[in-house]
Amino acid sequence: MALQGLYQCFSHWGKNGGTFIIGDTHFGEEDLKKAFPNRPNDDELVKIINQKVGKCGTLILLGDVGDLEYAKKLKGYKILVCGNHDKGHTAYREIFDEVYEGPVLISSRILLSHEPVPHAEWVMNIHAHVHDAKVKIDKYHFNTCADRINYTPINFNQWLKEGHLSHLISTRKRVIDGATERKRKRGGKKIGEK
């Protein structure tokens, strides 16, 4: 099912299946197993992701892929938003269908990035990078780090249906209502207009 409201250049995402998001797979990086003892091994993580995404789904990986031999095993249409560990973009372009080197604004309300973008109250920033469960950011950020989402990609379509953007609508309404009220107090004149 295609996602509604995406900018035209991203409208093909999820056309043939669901859209799923995860970050920080860190394939082949054994030190994470020490920090997160419940972390599945790399083959198991690939299996978990593939069971969700399937052959026809879209997988958005929000950086820090790790060993590309495991990334090659991932199914579906693969999109990478590069993370701080992702070096050598040419190799990624051979494996991923789309590669973005920095944050990507995919709609008027959704920003995808590896690291959380600070002061982004105008959008929902879906990111990864933050492994520590004790670190809380704010209601304008959603963390898809594999270690924070039980190593299972979120179903983006379902996430949207659950109303995760509803507070953005009220924030925008509050800003617009405030601007309208200030303009009314100026007698309908623009700022600086006499």
Over which residues does each language-model region extend?
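Conserved beta-sheet core of the metallophosphoesterase superfamily
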Residues: T90-D177
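Active-site neighborhood of phospho(di)ester-bond hydrolases with catalytic His/Asp-centered motifs
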Residues: I21-G23, L59-D64, I79-N84, L112-S113, ...
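Short Lys/Arg-rich cationic patches that frequently serve as NLS/NoLS or arginine-rich RNA/DNA-binding motifs
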Residues: A2-Y7, E181-K194
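Active-site neighborhood of divalent metal-dependent phosphoester bond hydrolases
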Residues: K34-R39, I48, L68-P116, A120
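Intrinsically disordered, low-complexity, compositionally biased regions/tails
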Residues: L32, I106, H167, R182, ...
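N-terminal active-site segment of His-dependent metallophosphoesterases
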Residues: M1-Y70, E162, K173-D177
